């Protein structure tokens, strides 16, 4: 399966050491199956780092993950929101997995997490506020072993 990573440089040898902050699924190396989404990520990072262009790295991802601890979030947001909130709060709930698959929340997720954790909103309200990009996905590689065994860089291009 082909997956993509958006950044400001080609990432030939991904590693978890460069994951400096907890995202939806914790600290890890994030890819997507959606080319346009990776291009958007690359352009956003280029803007943040004041670069002229972003770079999308393309990888072949092995689909046989039987020897790895894999978490897949389907359409049910109930478990997903608690997991994302825990990860965004810096809790290491993600560390029990090697690879995590799921949807991508919109940019309001930080506000929703704050409202939910402060008790201002209950879970139902928080779930209703988080809008999921139906066609976007994210795959987080949590362990270096998973990256080394499952991802192989094919190429990269500028956006």
Region roles according to the model:
Residues 23-24, 40, 44-159:
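Conserved NAD+-utilizing ADP-ribose enzyme module
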Residues 1-29, 37-47:
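Glycine-rich loop/turn
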């Amino acid at each position: 399966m082909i997956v993509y990573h958006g950044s400001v440089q080609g990432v030939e040898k991904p590693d978890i050491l460069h994951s400096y902050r907890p995202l939806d699924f914790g600290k890890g190396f994030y890819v997507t199956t959606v080319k346009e989404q990776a291009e958007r990520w690359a352009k956003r990072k280029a803007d943040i780092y004041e670069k002229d262009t972003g770079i999308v790295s393309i990888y072949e991802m092995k689909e046989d993950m039987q020897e790895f601890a894999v978490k897949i979030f389907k359409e049910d947001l109930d478990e997903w929101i608690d997991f994302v909130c825990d990860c965004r709060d810096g809790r290491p709930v993600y560390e029990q997995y090697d690879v995590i698959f799921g949807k991508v929340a919109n940019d309001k997720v930080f506000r929703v997490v704050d409202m939910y954790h402060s008790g201002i909103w209950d879970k139902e309200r928080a779930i209703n506020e988080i809008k999921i990009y139906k066609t976007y996905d994210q795959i987080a590689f949590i362990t270096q072993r998973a990256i080394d065994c499952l991802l192989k860089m094919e190429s990269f291009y500028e956006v």
